[in-house]
Amino acid sequence: SYAGSTTSTANYNTGLGYIALNANTGGYNTAAGALAGYRNASGQYNTSLGFSALEGVASNNHSYNTAIGGRSNELVTTGGYNITLGYQSGDNITSGDGNIIIGSVNADSATDDAQLKITSYDGTTTVNWIAGDSSGNIIHAGTTHSAGGQLTTTGKALVMGF
């Protein structure tokens, strides 16, 4: 399978699938699936499950990512602490950190940090259930909430508190 076939100095890695973790010199990585973690040169503590999950582009160094799903977080180069779940979830993230993407959808930005996106997809239509950004703004099914500031809503809303 060539999994980890050119890895020479890495410790505690597990690669399963065609050229999974092929050139990695970092440690504590787990990759299952063809091309999973393939171009991760020295990153560590990554978990990738699915075809091309956390594959990366060129030689790169990404650490502390969890990608589950085919092509999940596929283009990462230096981004870390990302969680992506679903087919092609967050596959556009290159250097963003601390993003959580659930569902078959891209992050709003390939380089921003602390993005949140929870979606559903039926093969033709994507519905964003919850989205958030590093400023604390949260969008919940068409309603915008701002943490630590003024609450703004669209549509019918009941607001209680001071």
Spell out what each predicted region is:
Residues S1-F162:
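Glycine- and small/polar-enriched repetitive beta-structure motifs of secreted/surface proteins
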